[in-house]
Amino acid sequence: MQIQLLAVGTKMPTWVTEGFNEYKKRFPADCKLVLHEIAAQKRTRKADLNRVMQQEGKSLLQAIPKGNRIVTLEVKGQAWDTPKLAQQLEKWQMDGRDVTLLIGGPEGLSDECLAAAEQRWSLSKLTLPHPVVRLIVAESLYRAWSLNNNHPYHRE
């Protein structure tokens, strides 16, 4: 199975890239974590932010491989603790499909992205910076994988 983190925004700070890559390399070949970045639309003072969000949403949806399970990351999604995320990861693996996790831009995800989602995941009720979300997702998924595989990384 492959877990694709599909995120709006490029040119992340070095610490974000290094942190994500550290977790990415820990995953085994049968549960790969990959990052695919979509360029953010330009935001000016007079920009129609709804239109910007729609354009970013269209780009996100076009980048999803056919047949993938789509999971959006959003404040209004379902909160999963580590054991629940581990259960979700196990279900995804048993399903046999690859998974795409969507992270929107500063305004969030378009209605089309939300409608395409099979699941909605909330990391927190807090508003989190998008670079930090990438790290939290990568670490949380690795922790869930380690729990499912009796790896000593996760401790209760």
From Swiss-Prot:
UniProt keyword annotation of S-adenosyl-L-methionine present? yes
Q: What is its EC number?
A: 2.1.1.177
Q: What is the predominant subcellular site recorded for this chain? A: cytoplasm
Assigned GO CC terms? cytoplasm
The organism's superkingdom is given as Bacteria
Per UniProt, subcellular location reads as: Cytoplasm
**EC top class, as a word:** transferase
Which keywords belong to this entry?
A: Cytoplasm, Methyltransferase, rRNA processing, S-adenosyl-L-methionine, Transferase
Q: Which reaction does it catalyse?
A: pseudouridine(1915) in 23S rRNA + S-adenosyl-L-methionine = N(3)-methylpseudouridine(1915) in 23S rRNA + S-adenosyl-L-homocysteine + H(+)
Any one GO molecular-function label of the UniProt entry: rRNA (pseudouridine-N3-)-methyltransferase activity
**Complex and partners:** Homodimer.
| Family listed | Belongs to the RNA methyltransferase RlmH family.
Query: Protein name, please?
Result: Ribosomal RNA large subunit methyltransferase H
Q: Which organism is it from?
A: Idiomarina loihiensis (strain ATCC BAA-735 / DSM 15497 / L2-TR)
